[in-house]
Regions:
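C-terminal structural segment of proteins
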Residues: 1-208
Length: 208
């Protein structure tokens, strides 16, 4: 890897200050995508901003009709949450199917949606569950957030703070996982609401 400066701020204000002062900085949470990318020299940020210790980014809140999950909440925390298991059990099951125990203990929901891997699980859950992504600058609907392969609507110095999911009447997620990585070779998330049924697909290309 290339040389870089490592920063570990304690507040969002400190994060924004470092971002504004360092044009080639990258956010580090679980590091499950960024660190391997850096090891392969496909990314060379001048500064790594570790947000894993910022408490205001790690939470799961029941708001009645919605559930809000902080960006640094790990996959294991999602699958273990009584709130999620009771209100959106399909989301807990989705998290349980991600990677191996190491990935689930380190990887975060915010990191996953910010990376927007076309074979990742959370993006289709966000779409089917009418999610709203809150950043340090604004709120974005899931439909507008996911732009293309590995591409989102996040602007320069903009980071994900939390994701708010609507609670469906019922929902289910099924995928055909890669035997090694457990990424979805094809996956479908279906959610039923009063106003209709939402279906989102991950991992499947146009040509099959």
């Amino acid at each position: 890897m290339y040389n870089f400066v490592y920063e570990k701020p304690n507040t969002l204000e400190e994060v924004e200050k470092i971002l504004n002062e360092n044009e080639e900085s990258k956010i580090l949470a679980g590091g499950q995508t960024l660190i391997p990318t850096m090891k392969q020299r496909l990314a060379s940020p001048s500064t790594l901003i570790d947000i894993s210790d910022i408490n205001e980014l790690n939470f799961i809140n029941d708001n009645g009709d919605t559930i809000t999950i902080g960006a640094t909440t790990t996959h294991n925390e999602v699958l273990s949450s009584d709130i999620i298991k009771n209100k959106i059990p399909s989301l807990a099951a989705l998290a349980e199917g991600i990677g191996d125990p190491h990935v689930r203990n380190m990887g975060t929901i915010g990191g996953s949606i910010s990376n927007n891997d076309p074979t990742a699980d959370y993006p289709c859950a966000c779409l089917s569950l009418k999610a709203k992504i809150k950043t340090n600058k604004k709120e974005i609907s899931a439909e507008d957030f996911f732009v293309g392969l590995f591409e989102t609507a996040l602007e320069e110095n903009e980071i994900v703070i939390s994701i708010e999911f609507c609670i469906p009447q019922k929902a289910s997620y099924m995928k055909f996982p890669n035997p090694a990585s457990r990424y979805a070779m094809a996956g479908v998330y279906v959610a039923v609401f009063d106003d209709g049924i939402n279906v989102s697909v991950t991992g499947a290309s146009e040509n099959g």
